[in-house]
From Swiss-Prot:
Keywords: Cytoplasm, Ribosome biogenesis. Required for maturation of 30S ribosomal subunits. This is Ribosome maturation factor RimP. Belongs to the RimP family. Its main location: cytoplasm. It comes from Desulfatibacillum aliphaticivorans.
Amino acid sequence: MEQVRKLTGAALEAEGMDLVLAEFKREGGGYILRLYVDKEGGITLGDCTMVSRYVGDLLDAYADEMPRYRLEVSSPGLDRPLTREDHFRRFEGRTALIVTKEPREGRKKFRGVLSGALNGVITLVADEVPMEFALHEIESARLQYKHGESTC
């Protein structure tokens, strides 16, 4: 999967796009490769179609190394995943949910406002209390859309 991320991420970056998240999961009777892609100004249906064709052709060269899969390409959506430090920085001031790998203070889920991202440390303000999380401690993180909040 890491090789898929590297190949597709580099190819999309050359096209001015960002591979936000790549998931390879078993669902139903087969596998799904889901790519969440974004770019400045947002992604269009045409962009998703182009990425699907481009990545499909790129990964065909590795068909012998991967099980059969269905490729899905979409925008990250309003509750977009945050997977890299630059994602957290881009959305400072927005509400997010961080799930940690290990419990902290008896829990693993923390909701608050992103207030910083520097040197691999993410700062989230929950109930007016700043909390710091090292990127390697985070299992997953997503924006939490609130009605009336700007999506940019």
